[in-house]
């Protein structure tokens, strides 16, 4: 399954291995512009941007889209994608505690490991 990345972040190696493709060039620049709101958006602004992002996904030929970002945009984007027959996926990751020795000191950090996708069908 081809999954278009509709987030502002580059797909991880694990996500790429599962079929995620990042937008490139002008399409990526357009996506970032559409995902970033300057000032308080109206419902019309949100709806229009969701429609335009879904159009980018449709033009890519992807069967599914990995989405994430502003919570007020996601329901609109989900509907716009589903209206075009594009499956909606959210990345699911687990927090993994990692200990490393740095200069003789144990440093504990948390890393997020991609596990898979949650498909939203409502």
Q: What do these predicted regions represent?
A:
Residues 1-62, 76, 83-122:
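Long, low-complexity, Lys/Arg-enriched
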Residues 66-75:
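Gly/Ser/Thr-rich loops at beta-strand to alpha-helix junctions
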């Amino acid at each position: 399954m081809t999954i278009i990345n509709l987030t502002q972040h580059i797909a991880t190696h694990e996500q790429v291995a599962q079929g995620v493709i990042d937008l490139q060039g002008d399409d990526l620049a357009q996506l970032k512009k559409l995902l970033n709101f300057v000032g308080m958006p109206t419902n019309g602004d949100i709806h229009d941007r969701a429609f335009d992002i879904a159009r980018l996904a449709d033009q890519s030929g992807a069967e599914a889209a990995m989405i994430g970002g502003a919570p007020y945009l996601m329901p609109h984007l989900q509907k716009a994608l589903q209206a075009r027959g594009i499956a909606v996926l959210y990345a699911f990751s687990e927090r993994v505690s990692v200990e490393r020795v740095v200069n003789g000191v144990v440093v504990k950090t948390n890393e997020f490991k991609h596990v898979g996708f949650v498909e939203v069908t409502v």
